[in-house]
Amino acid sequence: MAALRQIAFYGKGGIGKSTTSQNTLAALVDHHVPRIPMIIRIGGYAQ
């Protein structure tokens, strides 16, 4: 089984974390990265 990969995006609300994570995933698929288990975490900074 392939090793688990993790990517995290952090920043203030409204900065585009969800868009960035979706674009990153689309780029990986577009570049034919082999299927690997992956966790994408999206978090915000506390005010």
Swiss-Prot record:
Molecular function GO labels: 4 iron, 4 sulfur cluster binding; ATP binding; metal ion binding; nitrogenase activity
InterPro entries for this protein: NifH/frxC, P-loop_NTPase
A biological process from GO: nitrogen fixation
Superkingdom of the source species: Bacteria
UniProt-annotated binding residues for ATP: G11, K12, G13, G14, I15, G16, K17, S18
Catalytic activity field: N2 + 8 reduced [2Fe-2S]-[ferredoxin] + 16 ATP + 16 H2O = H2 + 8 oxidized [2Fe-2S]-[ferredoxin] + 2 NH4(+) + 16 ADP + 16 phosphate + 6 H(+)
Details of cofactor binding: Binds 1 [4Fe-4S] cluster per dimer.
Cofactor(s) the record lists: [4Fe-4S] cluster
Enzyme nomenclature, EC number: 1.18.6.1
Annotated keywords: 4Fe-4S, ATP-binding, Iron, Iron-sulfur, Metal-binding, Nitrogen fixation, Nucleotide-binding, Oxidoreductase
Assembly information from the UniProt record: Homodimer.
Membership in a protein family: Belongs to the NifH/BchL/ChlL family.
Protein function: The key enzymatic reactions in nitrogen fixation are catalyzed by the nitrogenase complex, which has 2 components: the iron protein and the molybdenum-iron protein.
Protein name in the entry: Nitrogenase iron protein
Gene: nifH
